[in-house]
Amino acid sequence: MRMTLVHLSLSLFSCLLLVLSPTFIASTPVSEPELVVQEVNEKINASRRNLGVLSCGTGNPIDDCWRCDPKWEKNRQRLADCAIGFGKHAIGGRDGKIYVVTDSSDKDVVNPKPGTLRHAVIQDEPLWIIFARDMVIKLKEELIMNSFKTIDGRGASVHIAGGACITVQYVTNIIIHGVNIHDCKRKGNAYVRDSPSHYGWRTASDGDAVSIFGGSHVWVDHCSLSNCADGLIDAIHGSTAITISNNYLSHHNKVMLLGHSDSYTRDKNMQVTIAFNHFGEGLVQRMPRCRHGYFHVVNNDYTHWQMYAIGGSAAPTINSQGNRFLAPNDHVFKEVTKYEDAPRSKWKKWNWRSEGDLFLNGAFFTPSGGGASSSYAKASSLSARPSSLVASVTSNAGALFCRKGSRC
């Protein structure tokens, strides 16, 4: 992944941007991340208690927030109030207009055609982007998003596939929901527009499904992701305030990288919630692979991995709660965890803990650091949904089949 973005300008003022670094949109990290963990667990338990009241309830607090409404398509922006965890304040285009994508083409990435997805995401104002019909969108170059945008695939079968994919670079308040993103390719060495007034030269991209680079307040929910050139969801270079939830991930090697490098200490501010995802068939490693920050991994279903599930380096804090881990049959790869680039004398001081996880077929988690010490006391005050029920909570992971006039 990279940060090169050379702006061409329509004015002398814009030309000055050629010599400046991109604006870094920072998000102040939560000073007590355990309180966010506690809030997530409270919402999970509240949804569980409401199962007897809501006939459509699942115990998944995100889904129970909006999926019971048969008129969801008339109140699409309500979804923005349903996130949990570190990305809960990502409002996307909640306060803007609805933009309907009517054209699946992507012929001109410098002057995108109105009605295309690219034309929608580069606008300066908040927009809630929906799709007029089922579409397969093959992007010619990276889809560079502007701030305060929601991509909402509900009501259509939307595939972003076979070309470049989504880049969230130095922007904030992004929601990506209900789309299929797969077979992403490396692109680049081309001019690409990133706003109505600027376009710039993009160097070669890695081919991630969703690349978050210096982004904040980002929520990726109910997407199906697979088979891309590099990562499925990668977040680096100071990205933070992220929730990754209800996604179905499959057929991929390096699934999720959270943190740029061991030496990039700005990622100490990274805080990510990973909840209710199904890590499915054909996955190898990095579910996720973490550096520096705080990572809450809660109520996910791990049914396949070939090397390891959760790994990291540079002393990240990993809080694993109520997940289900089904190990592969190969006895060499039963361990859930992988401590990287450090001897045991160092990694034993990191804070990796497992609470209420379910381990099947010989799976095991190697904890480190304080474990259930005071640093986790607040996070432990309420447990996540029991891991034995994870299969039901994640049964609808991935892009949903939603039709107007009925519940999703």
Swiss-Prot record:
Enzyme class name: lyase
GO MF terms, alphabetically ordered: metal ion binding; pectate lyase activity
Gene Ontology CC, one term: mitochondrion
Pathway(s) it belongs to: Glycan metabolism; pectin degradation; 2-dehydro-3-deoxy-D-gluconate from pectin: step 2/5
GTP-binding keyword on record: no
Cofactor annotation comment: Binds 1 Ca(2+) ion. Required for its activity.
Span of the signal peptide: 1-27
Active-site residue list: R286
Alphabetical list of SMART domains matching this protein: Amb_all
Any one Pfam family match given in the protein's UniProt record, by short name: Pectate_lyase_4
EC number: 4.2.2.2
Glycosylation sites: N45
Gene Ontology process terms (BP): pectin catabolic process
Lineage: superkingdom: Eukaryota
Keywords in alphabetical order: Calcium, Glycoprotein, Lyase, Metal-binding, Signal
Binding site for Ca(2+): D206, D230, D234
Cofactor: Ca(2+)
Keyword rRNA-binding included in the entry's annotation: no
Coiled coil: none
Catalyses which reaction(s): Eliminative cleavage of (1->4)-alpha-D-galacturonan to give oligosaccharides with 4-deoxy-alpha-D-galact-4-enuronosyl groups at their non-reducing ends
Family label: Belongs to the polysaccharide lyase 1 family.
The protein's name in its UniProt record: Probable pectate lyase 5
Species the sequence originates in: Arabidopsis thaliana
